[in-house]
Amino acid sequence: MLILISPAKTLDYQSPLTTTRYTLPELLDNSQQLIHEARKLTPPQISTLMRISDKLAGINAARFHDWQPDFTPANARQAILAFKGDVYTGLQAETFSEDDFDFAQQHLRMLSGLYGVLRPLDLMQPYRLEMGIRLENARGKDLYQFWGDIITNKLNEALAAQGDNVVINLAADEYFKSVKPKKLNAEIIKPVFLDEKNGKFKIISFYAKKARGLMSRFIIENRLTKPEQLTGFNSEGYFFDEDSSSNGELVFKRYEQR
């Protein structure tokens, strides 16, 4: 089983590391090409392209400038410990044991605009380059055209290595669009998390993101390898709703706290 999650905009390069082990990203040649394109952008262009403040644009222009392909623990950090958004609040990788990291390294992948696919222990230097950004490059008008089949091929390699054919899609749509489902040698299962609001169940972004992290943690902690085992997920009040689910979509609901 291969779990897919999105990266995060918020990064943490200060907290103590839970593990000293690391690997190197497998698609750095591609990352280097994107950095080459990104370095052509001025801070105002970055601000417009990414819809971010002038201050953040300046920070990210500096990141593009400082990025260099010789990754070491001195200038980079394991991806699963560097990302700090809502998904990662649910995942809580900073509390993983070495055995948890081992399982995650085999079964979890982070999709990334700059790095394509990251394994949990892959070192990464700080960046911001969301998959949906229209950064023109030698291969096309945006990052989807840049990555083409590369991400899908890398996921197929990971599936073949574990002798499995199930992908658990916990990534945002913006990121899963970089995967070609018809070329993926896997059945795709998508967990959906609905929260009750005023008597109706719907996707509430903040809660859904955290729930994707909670589900990832549930799979890793319990060493789950079969999709039917996911129905036992009950973290923070969620429960499986079989009637609302289908073959490719597992629906989990949570009642409003009263």
From Swiss-Prot:
Q: Which GO terms describe its biological process?
A: response to hydroperoxide
InterPro entries hit by this protein:
YaaA
- What domain of life does the UniProt record list for this protein's source? Bacteria
HAMAP family with a match to the protein in the record? UPF0246
Q: Please name the NCBIfam families in this protein's record.
A: PRK02101.1-1, PRK02101.1-3
Question: Which protein family is it in?
Answer: Belongs to the UPF0246 family.
Give the protein name, as stated in the record: UPF0246 protein YaaA
Q: What organism does the UniProt record list as the source?
A: Shigella flexneri serotype 5b (strain 8401)
